[in-house]
Amino acid sequence: MAFSGHKILVTGPTGQVGFVVAQALARQDNEVWGVARFSDPEKKKVLEAAGVKCVSADLEKGDFSSIPKDFDYVVHLGVFRAAGDDFDLDFRNNAEGTGLLMSHCRAAKGFLACSTTGVYQAAGHSLLKETSELGDNHRSMMTTYSITKIATEAVVRYAAREFNLPTIITRLCVPYGNNGGWPYYHLLMMKHGTPIQLHPDKPSMYSLLHEDDIVASIPALLQAATVPANIVNWGGAETVSIEDWSAYLGELTGTKPILEYTDKGPLESVMVDTTKLFSITGPLKTNWKDGMRRMIAAKHPDWLV
């Protein structure tokens, strides 16, 4: 889908997903503004070189004095994760901060609020639909994460109606690609001989989504924004286990994964039904093995055997 000539705000442009998305939208001849704290000056330089206008803002304080109000679209990928279990701080930055941002950008044609499949109640190896039960999925790994994301979704749903702002909430599963992701961290663990801890309800299955497919799906998702807010799973066509992708990463690099099963910490499987997503975006095309190989080639080409 052609998507150019728009004024777009991207939050979290220094993050794994936002870094790729902001640059891709700028390359498509859009006026892209990136909002973050920009603690890494090198990433800021790369973004600016790609044509992204980088500005600092504080979502917790609601200080958007550096940001105009006339954006056509907002792609809200930014997330704040407090250390430990500070729910109050996470709520202020994520839930309240998102509501304040939506108020500031209420004139937009579409607002994409990136959530997570971590909002679902763990359901073993069942496919999770947008209507599936919600729960505290990620507590064993990130204490505040799931509840904070659920709270943020509630604020987003309210703000979409209050400001008549067409909105889509995308529940992202496992993003990966040339800029890294969870499989890349597993590869680093393998290279260092560190065990990969997995839940005993094996295999540990997830809906991988390559960064190319994330970028390709954004225009259609923004067009699908509605009032009340639309909600859609954001995962790839292939459901892959950590066991399989770590084994394949091992084949590519000559490294053997060490798998350790324990119920004290690791997440359970999260597999999502993508029927609704594909009705909006059409099929997403990246084969997971090709995506993994390209990830290694981009990060450490010398590791490929």
Which sequence ranges carry the predicted segments?
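NAD(P)-dependent short-chain dehydrogenase/reductase
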Residues: A154-Y206, E211-D213, L249
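NAD(P)H-binding glycine-rich loop region in Rossmannoid oxidoreductase-like domains
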Residues: P41, V52-N93
